[in-house]
């Protein structure tokens, strides 16, 4: 789940807090006594002590409200037929397996999703000379009368002579990578009412066909999932729909999901293609109802668009596509993050979230409890999980995994390399697993959790997993002395707020009688920006948040009085509550009220800065921290939403990730000061920065054109990070490139 944070900083306080920032250190992995003997991973979650209503009729039952709405574009497409997995054609060699030096072929550049480029023209010595090479306007931003839901989050890809991107509303665009001139644009006609919480398109997938001959239309194609649940394939050269993919280039992804309304389910992440199967996940809007549309994961033939298999958690032995009045089981854990494919192992690594109704788990099935907030490795030949590793047991804190897994090789005990997977989490725990088996390569301990909780029939897991072999991306548990403010009165207000809440450290259980403090918060730790990894130096780059939340369950009567209702209720009004943050959680005994842990009068967080950090970890020499610094200045932040203009790096909340290059640089936006930075990979020193026209909440990328290196970032802003929204893709280069 992705939600807003406000940050305010005053000049004097930023200065006063600088010693605190300088001494911010990694916390121990957390208190919690002796490690449990239980094994981390699948199924290690406690079961309810009371019988709870888990009737399978609920999992199969439709929403009591709206039928499939005609406004969902996918509903206008015919259903797609199925084929046997054995009929999927052998996949041609893909450029993402071994990208050309100057290309950025996938969301994370390559099949391993490292976000590393070998390009080295731009270095710490000359980065200060970077200038804007060109700006491209996507034209996608809120129009008069529309609620601002925009947060493009886009990372372009560059293949050969094309720079390919998408607008926040899913139009697919090809640009000249040296000039930014538009070569073609495919309007896919996503409607405003199909936007869920956010209008976002993280990117598109490049695929080379083994069926269509080279030189023919759609031999090279772009595949995209849309906000209104279509899977689209267009020719990479012309932008024309691929006629032999689905129905005229489109597949209806609403097929089998049952009843829904526009904006309830959506795709925002580029789908990976593994051994000829394009794997599709989707976001299900949080906080709505227990029996929301399914979180099913599906595989389609990348050549024809035909259905191949489904992984439906509560019908795990049935991989077929529902027909007639059947549909996938409702309310199951969904996956909204970007997945990672592994052609060698024939697996797709799926970061999962929670079952619908994040903060109440008593109605979840045993199968759901085993796979929520986990990495699930699905065999792309069958649709069956090969292994599951769970990062939070019986999660009621919205610790769904937002990050994409990064693949790398680790040295094994016998001198052989072990194929590894790095999985960041919102908890700030980074798990390093054998990607063949899901077993930890670096130590993981099960530690006692603080309390079973007080919610009837919904006890918490007695233990939780801690990745003790990696530095924890978090600070120590909060204390009352950590509270601060612009004045003694503000600090006193926050101390009183701290005392009024339940808080016993990480995994403080939910409560109804009073609020509880959730730290780490649901924005991380690490979130969807993921990590970047330099395979040459062995340095892993992570940016992360220190932003607690203040949550409270409310009775159904109270939820009704607050006007909380699900999106498919006929009385629901957009912007009237219940879409994110506060949620109805209809079908459970409770609603949920969620706010940042802040002083609502000034808009300042109650915990002292920093609120965002960037860290370099040496993965080749004991997983040690090389350096760690606050990320983000106070220039665009201040009390009551007023910018201070101060350049001090106080560390702001951040969303978006980084790029690391052969030139020894890290490029990152992410922070709420609306800047892009170049940071020396080895020292952490900022060697260049530039103010963006909108928030830099997107992963940047870098590529080469005409012999010169360029750096691109979508400065689209982010409505819930409260950064300026824009439609501008900004591309930088050294002066020699711009003169051409």
UniProtKB/Swiss-Prot annotation:
Compositionally skewed regions (Polar residues) per UniProt: 46-58
Ranges of compositional bias, category Low complexity: 34-43
Record's subcellular location: Secreted
Cofactor(s) the protein requires to work: pyrroloquinoline quinone
Region (Disordered): 28-105, 442-468
Xref: InterPro entries: PQQ_b-propeller_rpt (IPR018391), PQQ_mDH (IPR017511), PQQ_rpt_dom (IPR002372), Quinoprotein_ADH-like_sf (IPR011047)
Keywords linked to the UniProt accession: Oxidoreductase, Secreted, Signal
Disulfide bonds: none
GO molecular function: glycerol dehydrogenase (acceptor) activity; quinone binding; quinoprotein glucose dehydrogenase activity
Catalyzed reaction equations: glycerol + A = dihydroxyacetone + AH2
Class of enzymatic activity (EC top level): oxidoreductase
Entry-linked Pfam families: PQQ (PF01011)
Signal peptide start and end residues: 1-29
Entry's EC annotation: 1.1.99.22
GO cellular component terms given for this protein: extracellular region; membrane
TM annotation in the entry: none
Function: Catalyzes the oxidation of glycerol to glycerone. Also acts, more slowly, on a number of other polyols including D-sorbitol, D-arabinitol, D-mannitol, meso-erythritol, adonitol and propylene glycol.
Family recorded in the similarity comment: Belongs to the bacterial PQQ dehydrogenase family.
Protein name, UniProt field: Glycerol dehydrogenase large subunit
Organism of provenance: Gluconobacter thailandicus
Lineage: Bacteria, Pseudomonadati, Pseudomonadota, Alphaproteobacteria, Acetobacterales
């Amino acid at each position: 789940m992705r939600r807003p944070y406000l940050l305010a900083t005053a000049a004097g306080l930023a200065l006063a807090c600088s010693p605190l920032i300088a001494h911010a250190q990694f916390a121990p992995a957390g208190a919690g006594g002796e490690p449990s003997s239980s094994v981390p991973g699948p199924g290690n979650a406690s079961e309810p002590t009371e019988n709870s209503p888990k009737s399978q009729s609920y999992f199969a039952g439709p929403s009591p409200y709206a039928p499939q709405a005609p406004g969902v574009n996918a509903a206008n497409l015919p259903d797609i037929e199925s084929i046997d997995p054995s009929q999927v054609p052998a996949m041609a060699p893909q450029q993402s397996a071994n990208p050309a030096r100057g290309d950025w072929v996938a969301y994370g550049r390559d099949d391993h999703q490292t976000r590393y480029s070998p390009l080295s023209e731009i270095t710490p010595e000359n980065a200060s000379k970077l200038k804007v090479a060109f700006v491209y306007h996507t034209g996608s931003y809120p129009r008069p009368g529309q609620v601002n839901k925009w947060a493009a989050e886009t990372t372009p890809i560059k293949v050969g002579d094309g720079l390919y991107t998408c607008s926040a509303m899913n139009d697919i665009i090809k640009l000249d990578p040296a000039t930014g001139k538009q070569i073609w644009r495919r309007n896919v006609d996503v409607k405003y009412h199909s936007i869920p919480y956010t209008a976002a398109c993280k990117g598109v997938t490049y695929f080379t066909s083994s069926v269509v001959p080279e030189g023919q239309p759609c031999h090279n194609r772009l595949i995209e999932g849309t906000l209104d649940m279509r899977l689209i394939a267009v020719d990479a050269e012309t932008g024309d729909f691929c006629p032999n993919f689905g129905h005229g280039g489109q597949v209806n992804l609403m097929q089998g999901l049952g009843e829904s309304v526009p904006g309830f389910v959506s795709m925002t992440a580029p789908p990976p293609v593994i051994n000829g199967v394009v794997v599709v996940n989707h976001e299900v809007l949080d906080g709505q109802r227990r029996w929301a549309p399914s979180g099913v994961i599906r595989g389609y033939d990348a050549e024809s668009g035909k259905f191949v298999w489904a992984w439906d958690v509560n019908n795990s032995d049935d991989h077929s596509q529902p027909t007639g009045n059947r549909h996938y089981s409702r309310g199951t854990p969904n996956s909204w993050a970007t997945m990672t494919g592994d052609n060698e192992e024939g697996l797709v690594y799926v970061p999962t979230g929670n079952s619908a109704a994040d903060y109440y788990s008593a109605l979840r099935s045993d199968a759901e409890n085993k796979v929520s907030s986990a990495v699930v490795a699905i065999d792309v030949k069958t649709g069956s999980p090969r292994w599951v590793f769970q990062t939070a047991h019986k999660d009621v804190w919205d610790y769904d995994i937002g990050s994409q897994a990064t693949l790398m090789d680790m040295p094994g005990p016998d001198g052989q390399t072990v194929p590894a997977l790095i999985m960041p989490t919102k908890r700030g725990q980074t798990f390093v697993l054998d990607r063949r088996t899901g077993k930890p390569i670096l130590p993981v301990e099960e530690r006692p959790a603080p309390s079973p909780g007080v919610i009837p029939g919904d006890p918490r897991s007695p233990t939780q997993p801690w990745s003790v072999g990696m530095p924890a991306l978090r600070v120590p548990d909060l204390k009352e002395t950590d509270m601060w403010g612009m004045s003694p009165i503000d600090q006193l207000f926050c101390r009183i707020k701290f005392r009024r809440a339940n808080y016993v450290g990480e995994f403080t259980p939910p409560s109804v009688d009073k609020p509880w403090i959730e730290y780490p918060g649901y924005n991380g730790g690490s979130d969807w920006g993921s990590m970047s990894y330099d395979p040459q130096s062995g340095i892993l780059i992570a940016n992360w948040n220190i932003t607690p939340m203040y949550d409270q369950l409310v009775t159904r009567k109270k939820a009704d009085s607050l006007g909380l209702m699900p999106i498919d209720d006929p009385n629901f009004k957009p912007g009237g509550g219940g879409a994110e943050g506060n949620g109805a959680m209809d079908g459970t005994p409770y609603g949920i009220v969620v706010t940042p842990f802040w002083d609502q009068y000034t808009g300042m967080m109650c915990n002292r800065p920093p609120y965002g950090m960037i860290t370099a970890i040496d993965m080749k020499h004991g997983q040690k921290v090389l350096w760690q610094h606050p990320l983000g200045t106070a220039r665009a932040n201040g009390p009551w939403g007023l910018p201070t203009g101060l350049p001090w790096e106080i560390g702001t909340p951040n969303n978006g990730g980084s790029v690391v290059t052969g030139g020894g640089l890290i490029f990152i936006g992410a922070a709420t000061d609306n800047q892009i930075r170049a940071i020396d990979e080895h020292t952490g020193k900022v060697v260049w920065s530039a103010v963006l026209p909108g928030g830099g909440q997107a992963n940047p990328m870098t590529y080469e054109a005409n012999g010169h290196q360029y750096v691109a970032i979508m400065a689209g802003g982010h409505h819930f990070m409260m950064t300026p929204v824009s439609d501008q893709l900004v591309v930088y280069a050294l002066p020699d490139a711009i003169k051409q």
